[in-house]
């Protein structure tokens, strides 16, 4: 925005310090071969409407999430090729993983109604390569599968369960007279430590960090959790497939995000968020040994999310990324600043 450029705000500083050319729409868009829209979903319609008036013929429009196309139903000029590169993590983690020489798992897709030259997939591959995702894994998906699986993953295992489990596990430990500071650190950093094993060996490796008796206990607990939550997960999936979930979310956008901000405030006011800081280091294995319930929750949530998505017709690539592969990167945000950070960056 011109106003941001004139004021040289933080986004301007970030861009210029990283050697990006900064200018307004009218100066940059008409000459661009590829225009990437990374604005929040609620801003997409206005942004894309403006972009289409300025984009040159036969150019490419890129999304990192297909909500605007699938749920809002945005119509794009037929000469514009529409592609998607959807890193399976918050945007902050895309940058951090790239800086350390790696990347994040990514889904790529082409909007079939906007691929007039049949070159969309090659451009999407090149874009995903440029952010380092080829080092972590790039799978071809579709706009619909990415959106439906993304919404399902975030509402269940990725955000919903991590948030609810953090609050409930903390309250249980406090009720049992454990040190509040230790309990908070065990949970806050425990998700990150435990899910790191998912990156390298999935649920099997995570479970292998436990003793045999603890494995059996975690397995039994996870099976109980799955039975309790199966109908709830299926209801979430039904609401997402039908479009009801997205419809309610867009209504909240028009109401200045009242529900979202109220929920975010409720989370910020929980005892877990306000817990004292534990200064001492917790050994890595201790997170596993004292986190059997957390491991059971992760196992149940991953399996149930994946199974529910597959049973609803979502392709396995999208279901896998949204149930397991993105989980460690979401856990990273909790480790930094607990649940409020996760809610803000998602």
Swiss-Prot record:
Binds 2 magnesium ions per subunit. One of its GO terms (biological process) is L-valine biosynthetic process. The active site is at 65. Residues 1-141 form the KARI N-terminal Rossmann domain. It catalyses: (2R)-2,3-dihydroxy-3-methylbutanoate + NADP(+) = (2S)-2-acetolactate + NADPH + H(+); (2R,3R)-2,3-dihydroxy-3-methylpentanoate + NADP(+) = (S)-2-ethyl-2-hydroxy-3-oxobutanoate + NADPH + H(+). One of its GO terms (cellular component) is cytosol. Its EC number is 1.1.1.86. It comes from the Bacteria. It is an enzyme of class 1 (oxidoreductase). Mg(2+) 1 binds at residues 150, 154. Pathway: Amino-acid biosynthesis; L-isoleucine biosynthesis; L-isoleucine from 2-oxobutanoate: step 2/4; Amino-acid biosynthesis; L-valine biosynthesis; L-valine from pyruvate: step 2/4. GO terms for molecular function: ketol-acid reductoisomerase activity; metal ion binding; NADP binding. NADP(+) binds at residues 11, 41-43, 91. Keywords: Amino-acid biosynthesis, Branched-chain amino acid biosynthesis, Magnesium, Metal-binding, NADP, Oxidoreductase, Repeat. Residues 142-286, 287-346 form the KARI C-terminal knotted domain. InterPro entries: 6-PGluconate_DH-like_C_sf, 6PGD_dom2, KARI, KARI_C, KARI_N, KARI_prok, NAD(P)-bd_dom_sf. Coiled coil: none annotated. Its cofactor is Mg(2+). Mg(2+) 2 binds at residues 150, 322, 326. Gene3D superfamilies: N-(1-d-carboxylethyl)-l-norvaline Dehydrogenase, domain 2 (1.10.1040.10), NAD(P)-binding Rossmann-like Domain (3.40.50.720). NCBIfam families: ilvC (TIGR00465). Belongs to the ketol-acid reductoisomerase family. Involved in the biosynthesis of branched-chain amino acids (BCAA). Catalyzes an alkyl-migration followed by a ketol-acid reduction of (S)-2-acetolactate (S2AL) to yield (R)-2,3-dihydroxy-isovalerate. In the isomerase reaction, S2AL is rearranged via a Mg-dependent methyl migration to produce 3-hydroxy-3-methyl-2-ketobutyrate (HMKB). In the reductase reaction, this 2-ketoacid undergoes a metal-dependent reduction by NADPH to yield (R)-2,3-dihydroxy-isovalerate. This is Ketol-acid reductoisomerase (NADP(+)). It comes from Buchnera aphidicola subsp. Uroleucon ambrosiae. The gene is ilvC.
């Amino acid at each position: 925005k011109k106003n941001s450029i004139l004021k040289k705000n933080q986004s301007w500083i970030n861009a210029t310090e990283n050697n990006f050319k900064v200018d307004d729409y009218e100066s940059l868009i008409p000459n661009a071969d590829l225009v990437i829209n990374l604005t929040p979903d609620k801003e997409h319609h206005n942004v894309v409407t403006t972009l289409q008036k300025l984009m040159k013929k036969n150019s490419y429009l890129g999304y990192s999430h297909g909500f605007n196309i699938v749920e809002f139903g945005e119509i794009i000029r037929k000469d514009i090729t529409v592609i998607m590169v959807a890193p399976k993590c918050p945007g902050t983690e895309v940058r951090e993983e790239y800086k350390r020489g790696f990347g994040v798992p990514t889904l790529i897709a082409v909007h079939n109604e906007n691929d007039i030259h049949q070159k969309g997939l090659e451009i999407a591959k090149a874009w995903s390569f440029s952010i380092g995702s080829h080092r972590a894994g790039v799978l071809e998906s579709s706009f619909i599968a990415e959106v439906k699986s993304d919404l399902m993953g975030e509402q269940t295992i990725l955000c919903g369960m991590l948030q609810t489990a953090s609050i409930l596990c903390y309250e249980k430990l406090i009720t049992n007279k454990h040190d509040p500071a230790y309990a908070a650190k065990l949970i806050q950093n425990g998700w990150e430590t435990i899910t790191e094993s998912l990156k390298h060996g999935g649920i099997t490796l995570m479970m292998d960090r436990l003793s045999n008796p603890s494995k059996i206990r975690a397995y039994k607990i996870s099976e109980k959790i799955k039975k309790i939550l199966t109908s709830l997960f299926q209801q979430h999936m039904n609401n997402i497939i039908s479009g009801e979930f997205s419809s309610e979310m867009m209504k909240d956008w028009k109401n200045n995000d009242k529900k979202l901000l109220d929920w975010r405030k409720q989370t910020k006011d929980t005892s877990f968020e306000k817990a004292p800081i534990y200064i001492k280091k917790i050994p890595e294995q201790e997170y596993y040994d004292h986190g059997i319930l957390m491991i059971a929750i992760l196992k149940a949530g991953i399996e149930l999310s994946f199974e529910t998505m597959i049973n609803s017709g979502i392709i396995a690539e999208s279901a896998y990324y949204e149930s397991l592969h993105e989980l460690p990167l979401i856990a990273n945000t909790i480790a930094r600043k607990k649940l409020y950070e996760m809610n803000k960056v998602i």
